A protein has these predicted regions:
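Bacterial N-terminal signal peptides
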Residues: 7-18
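Positively charged n-region of N-terminal signal peptides that target proteins for export
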Residues: 1-6
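Compositional signal for N-terminal targeting/processing segments
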Residues: 21-357
Length: 357
């Protein structure tokens, strides 16, 4: 059965993608005669960070108390529908199955699992809405269709909609290039519009990766306006956004070391390591901030190598010096020094590599 479905969807793939690729952005006509009078509260996140999911849960509980019930998520429609079924069940079998399907993604972590469990306990009348393309179409998507088939519900809107979203997922995963990324961004807009139309003028809250929630930004490829940018052009002041992702960098140093730079010893605040698996020749990199080193090193020669704040696990501050040790797969190390002079690029601080000797 699944092979037949996939074959049909693949047959439609070229037509489905060429229209969106040709336009370069989601079809604004999909919004129809927009007369939405509710309020959209959109929050950007870094997936799977406890401090952020805790904040999102607190926000949703506050909105829930005020009467909001509709929570939009960066998930396919069928995943959201499946989770809505789970909210009505006594056990957690459905959540366990969906969570298992998320293995290998940023959603497969205990913080996200706890988030959903808390919603079931504290906000049981929540209605999830998924507006992403068909991720996990061969697992969650197929299981959702089989469930509805077992209930003889092949003609209900949720079943037909799931088939459409599976088609989007196959189109996206068969794209394999920047066009596929732009396609996904545009589909997220159209899917958002679709879901919003289902609830008339109710206020809603949404949680998405921060790459999708900047009302002035392009998508990750720079090809099309990102989701929130496009939604802003449709819903105007009805759309409110806030980026929660900086909370992920609001961390304390793990320990204090001593690092010598330009013949001077400095207190070095260590913030941990980042895995570089997948980068040729490198295993991981580690980060320090040198306390009080800026004045001594501000006139050091610059190499022209820039590193934005998004590369750091902690907040980057202006007028500071940072040390990054790169460890290669052969266990050799390379130490680089970066200085922050308050320069901004794409709304974030950037650091520049300096020569300390």
């Amino acid at each position: 059965m699944m092979k037949i479905r996939i074959a049909i969807v693949l047959f439609l793939y070229c037509a489905a993608t060429s229209v969106v690729y040709a336009h370069g952005k989601a079809d604004a006509d999909a919004a129809g005669n927009n007369n939405y009078t509710g309020t959209i509260y959109l929050y950007g996140e870094q997936h799977g960070v406890k401090k952020i999911t805790d904040k999102e849960l607190a926000l949703w509980r506050a909105y829930y108390t005020k009467g909001l019930r509709h929570l939009f998520l960066e998930l396919p429609s069928y995943t959201a529908e499946y989770l809505n079924m789970w909210l009505r069940e006594k056990d957690n079998t459905i959540l366990e199955e969906v969570f298992n399907d998320w293995k290998g993604t940023a959603f497969h972590n205990q913080h996200t699992y706890h988030f959903f469990m808390q919603i079931k306990e504290l906000c049981p009348q929540t209605v999830f809405h998924g507006t992403d393309v068909g991720h996990q179409y061969g697992t969650t998507g197929e299981r959702f269709l089989r469930y509805l088939e077992s209930k003889q519900q092949q003609n209900i809107p949720a079943y037909l909609r799931a088939q459409e979203i599976i088609q989007q997922g196959i189109a996206y995963y068969n794209g394999g290039n920047a066009k596929a990324m732009a396609y996904r961004e545009n589909m997220m807009v159209q899917n958002f519009i679709y879901e919003l139309k289902q609830i008339q003028n109710d206020n809603i809250m949404g949680i998405y990766g921060s790459a999708h929630t900047d009302t002035a930004a392009l998508d990750s490829t720079g090809a099309v306006p990102c989701m929130a940018n496009q939604l802003k052009s449709i819903y105007g002041n009805n759309l409110n956004t806030e980026d929660l992702s900086p909370l992920a960098k609001d961390i304390e140093p793990i320990r204090i070391d001593t690092i010598t730079a330009a013949h001077t010893d400095y207190r070095a605040y260590y913030y941990g390591k980042q895995d570089l698996t997948g980068f040729k020749d490198f295993a991981y990199r580690e980060f320090w901030q040198l306390d009080g080193a800026y004045q001594a090193l501000k006139n050091s020669g610059k190499t022209g190598d820039w590193l934005p704040e998004s590369n750091y696990p902690m907040k980057v501050e202006a007028y500071q010096v940072y040390v990054i040790d790169y460890t290669k797969i052969d266990n050799t190390k390379m130490r680089l020094y970066y200085i922050s002079e308050g320069k901004m690029q794409n709304r974030q601080l950037i650091t520049e590599n300096i020569a300390t000797e």
